[in-house]
Amino acid sequence: MKLLKIAVVVLGIACAGTTNANGSSVSSDVTEVTLTKPRMRWLWGGFGFHNSEATMTPLMSDEFRDQRVLKTFREIAPTYSRVFAGFADWTREAMDSFADYYDATFRRAGTTLYLVPGRMPVITDDFDFEGYCENVATRLDYLVKVCMCVKIRYYALTNEMASGPTWGWFSTHRDVYEKLCRALYAAFRRHGLDIGLMTPDSATPKYIDDVVWATKNLNDITEVYCWHYYDRAAKPGEARVYNDVYGHLTNLVSLCLGREKRISLGEWGMTGRNVPFREGHMRDDGHGGWRWPMSAFAREVAICRAEMGLAALNAGALNAVSWTFVDYPDPFLREDGDTPEEKARYDVARFSGWGLDVRYNKNGLFRWDDENKDYSSYPDLYTMGYLVKLFRKGARVLEPVFDDPELRVGAVTNPDGSCSVAVINWGAAKTVRITSAHPFAKPLRVYEYDSAKPPMNAFNDLQPMKGVVVATNGVFATTLPSRAMAFFTTDYTDRTPPSVTGVKLGGDGALVWNTSADSDHVYYRVYRDGEQIASTVATRLDVKGAKGVYAVRSVDRWGNVSE
């Protein structure tokens, strides 16, 4: 398999040069892309995020939860997710809080979950291996059988082979790692849990040998192999962004297939510019959008994030997780207290990952900044949103063939015959003609991200469709801006959702309305005097009694808006 998985022909078709909508010149050539449909195509398990917020709801205001977190999750509806969860000392209160979040998000989207309990505790000489694993299994038993969190499908022993403060500790203590994994496997079987082990959950090319070792020593108890990759040096547009992910995963896919297994890209991300981990007295774990807001780098690295996902898709990975869905909150201290609020905060600190008091972990699609009440989106929302929404689990991959080194392409078909295509253009604005071996049953909706003018939205709504394009015999042409990404899809239903009823101002100064009975409803948009003032999953909005003409519209899972 070749890097960039392409072979294409760039046709020098004689046609007049054109100008794109943004005023940039468009190449007079037409770049040809062919989507092939091999007899045997690999099954895709879905893109998703590390949903760190799933254990952090006690820290959220109602406004942040309903208007940003739940609203954005339901709009994207990821079909795969990774969560720091499954702790051996997880409290009933914290598990119930997680189960409530599960009901509000994962259950609605049918999201498959991969759990990992952050970092394992330090392995001491008297560590109780069997007791630890039994405690994990008992808690998962409660979540699966009592709370009915049945989409918990995978579990990894620890994040990136870490033990306590030592990242990668198990890479040099593999005998201990194996002993614990086998004890976990036995505990899950005793409890009748259909939860497969993901091993080794290691990271970086330096530790690929952990995966090789696991295939030789843990294949009998491993459900899926797992590896992480971060790019901290490449620049947007460099071929290495795609090629490094594609190359490493192609080799790992082959290795794991030889053991009758598949591999997951358990985390991926890109920071770039060789940024040091430490800045001043704190650790910097932020992406470009947080470090350099709305800079050219931040606007373009949002494309890189999706580009790395396409590399995983085309390399044959089972699924892939982008770190993270929402920013972590600002650092805070871990300490118990007497009030319910203090105890909830203590549980969040214990069960949400390592180093919450020293890290600025800002890698989300949108901000979590309580101090400044800033929950706005990063450019990443408008590349990753549709990648995760449209490239969902249960799809099969179409192999793209082309020869333009400035393009990146990915495509899938779904069991209902619908198809989604993603195209990245790192070159000058150009016309691309796509020929698909899979027929397009209806016009394709088009969603575009132009890094020169990202489609930012004050309420974190995904960008509306730019329009539709009609294919003839599986062929359509489109013009792509420079350094941009576009999605084309027949995975939609064209409809008008039922209107929202019962809109009125309550006596407490809040606007209220009736719950939508539409099974495809996702969230509400609220308008005053024709201007949108909020997006929310709630049926109440505090407008402080402000006078005006109010309207509430329902948005369904395909982005259709009611009247």
Q: What residue spans do the PLM features occupy?
A:
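Noncatalytic carbohydrate-binding groove/subsite architecture in carbohydrate-active enzymes
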Residues: 174-315
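Short beta-strand elements bearing conserved aromatic residues within extracellular beta-rich modules
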Residues: 444, 524-526
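Carbohydrate-binding surface patches
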Residues: 402-442, 446-451, 483-487, 518-519, ...
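Beta-strand-rich modules
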Residues: 542-561
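Substrate-binding cleft and catalytic face of glycoside hydrolase catalytic domains
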Residues: 71-236
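Pro/Thr/Ser/Gly-rich low-complexity, intrinsically disordered linker/stalk tracts
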Residues: 492-520, 557-563
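Aromatic/acidic polysaccharide-binding cleft in carbohydrate-active enzymes
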Residues: 270-391, 395-408, 415
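C-terminal beta-strand-rich structural cap/linker in extracellular carbohydrate-active enzymes
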Residues: 464-495
